[in-house]
From Swiss-Prot:
TM segment ranges: none
Gene responsible for this protein: SHTN1
Record field: compositional bias (Pro residues): 352-369
Source organism of the structure: Pongo abelii (Sumatran orangutan)
Name listed for the protein in its UniProt record: Shootin-1
Domain of life according to the entry: Eukaryota
Family membership: Belongs to the shootin family.
Gene Ontology terms, MF aspect: actin filament binding
Keyword list, A-Z: Acetylation, Cell projection, Coiled coil, Cytoplasm, Cytoskeleton, Developmental protein, Phosphoprotein
Residues the record lists as N-acetylmethionine modifications: M1
Annotated region (Disordered), positions in chain: 343-405, 418-445
Length: 456
């Protein structure tokens, strides 16, 4: 019952360990996927930040150009105003010169006076519209035209720059929105990573608890094994003492008044029984060891014999293949000779030739020197009745015959042991050999789990 419970507990621990390892691997894969997504989002964010920085640089450049153009425009405005002021001054000077000239012309006649009056009327109108009039000189007109053209071009450039500024502002808004989205996605990914880390920590705790439980169970199992061995040895000693007491009581009952010789005989008998029991135990241990050695030796011998049989079978196969090829060649030759004879028969229908001689018999197969050499070695190594058995085993046999031979050998060996030695019952000695293998497998699995936990 204890062994079955321990096996169940070990199976449960192994299943829990496998589940924990599977969950750990899934979580690791998900963590790698999230890391890859996070790296991609980081790259996109870095690209967006670079684009934003480029847009900021371009916007700063545009703003600097606009400021430069505005300064240039203000300078041109001041130049135009100064040119207009010069034009008004020149106009006034021209008017004063005209008046002076007209005064000088008044001395000439009335016609000149009428012209002067007309000039005065024109002066009254030109005083009101002096700012709008153009300069009479060619240089002023050229400067004004150039300034107007520059103003128009500057206004057009200003409009273009304003449109570009609006576009850049819209792009900036889009980039800011993308950055905010990336930040939100990053926050979501960080939360998922934290959750996965928590789950991983839980799995690690569960696996650590499983490992601790396994170690405790292993320690308990070893303690139970030691206690069982001690109990068996104690039970054996008690059994020996009980047998001693039974014999002594039986002898005491037979003789109501025991003598000294009888007591000595009883003591000697008890000592002899004790020695016999000890020798029996030692003999049983030796028999166990010899049995294990014999099993190992028989297995090695069987493997060696099977290998030799394989080699011999391969050699026989090669010989048979050669014989088959030779027989095929002979059959071809015979067919060819039959065809030739048939042709001859057809040619000479009248004259019947005597029948051809029969083909010579096939030569016997050549003896195999390797097989004979191996049989000689076996005869020398096993010179008794076992030699005949080994020679039979060297011949190619079926697996059923091999198993029968094994069974016979084991039965003979057991009969010899039984005749010479009284063995223990089967329940005490026969123990399942699969347990240590399963425990070794569990130990290796637990060691792997410990290594995984240590690597983290």
């Amino acid at each position: 019952m204890n062994s079955s419970d321990e096996e169940k507990q070990l199976q449960l621990i192994t299943s829990l360990k496998e589940q924990a390892i599977g969950e750990y691997e899934d979580l690791r894969a998900e963590n790698q996927k999230t890391k890859e997504k996070c790296d991609k989002i980081r790259q996109e964010r870095d690209e967006a930040v670079k684009k934003l920085e480029e847009f900021q640089k371009i916007s700063h450049m545009v703003i600097e150009e606009v400021n430069f153009m505005q300064n240039h425009l203000e300078i041109e405005k001041t130049c135009r105003e100064s040119a207009e002021a010069l034009a008004t001054k020149l106009n006034k000077e021209n008017k004063t010169l005209k008046r002076i000239s007209m005064l000088y012309m008044a001395k000439l006649g009335p016609d000149v006076i009428t012209e002067e009056i007309n000039i005065d009327d024109e002066d009254s109108t030109t005083d009101t519209d002096g700012a709008a009039e153009t300069c009479v000189s060619v240089q002023c007109q050229k400067q004004i035209k150039e300034l107007r053209d520059q103003i128009v071009s500057v206004q057009e450039e200003k409009k273009i720059l304003a449109i570009e500024l609006e576009n850049l502002k819209s792009k900036l808004v889009e980039v800011i929105e993308e950055v905010n989205k990336v930040k939100q996605e990053k926050a979501v990914l960080n939360s998922e990573v934290l959750e996965q880390r928590k789950v991983l920590e839980k799995c690690n705790r569960v696996s650590m608890l499983a490992v601790e439980e396994y170690e405790e169970m292993q320690v308990n199992l070893e303690l139970e094994k030691d206690l069982r061995k001690k109990a068996e040895s104690f039970a054996q000693e008690m059994f020996i003492e009980q047998n001693k007491l039974k014999r002594q009581s039986h002898l005491l009952l037979q003789s109501s008044v025991p003598d000294q010789q009888l007591s000595k005989a009883l003591d000697e008998n008890a000592k002899l029984t004790q020695q016999l029991e000890e020798e029996r135990i030692q003999h049983q241990q030796k028999v166990k060891e010899l049995k294990e050695q014999l099993e190992n030796e028989t297995l090695h011998k069987e493997i060696h014999n099977l290998k030799q049989q394989l080699e011999l079978l391969e050699e026989d196969k090669k010989e048979l293949e050669l014989k088959y090829q030779n027989s095929e060649e002979k059959a071809r030759n015979l067919k060819h000779s039959v065809d030739e004879l048939q042709k001859r028969v057809n040619q000479s229908e009248n004259s019947v030739p005597p029948p051809p001689p029969p083909p010579p018999p096939l030569p016997p197969p050549p003896p195999n020197p390797i097989r004979s050499f191996m049989s000689m070695i076996r005869k020398r190594s096993h010179p008794s009745g076992s030699g005949a058995k080994k020679e039979k085993a060297t011949q190619p046999e079926t697996p059923e015959e091999v198993t029968d031979l094994k069974r016979q050998a084991v039965e003979e060996m057991m009969d010899r042991i039984k005749k010479g030695v009284h063995l223990r019952p089967v329940n005490q000695t026969a123990r399942p050999k699969t347990k240590p293998e399963s425990s070794k497998g569990c130990e290796s699995a637990v060691d792997e789990l410990k290594g995984i936990l240590a690597s983290q």
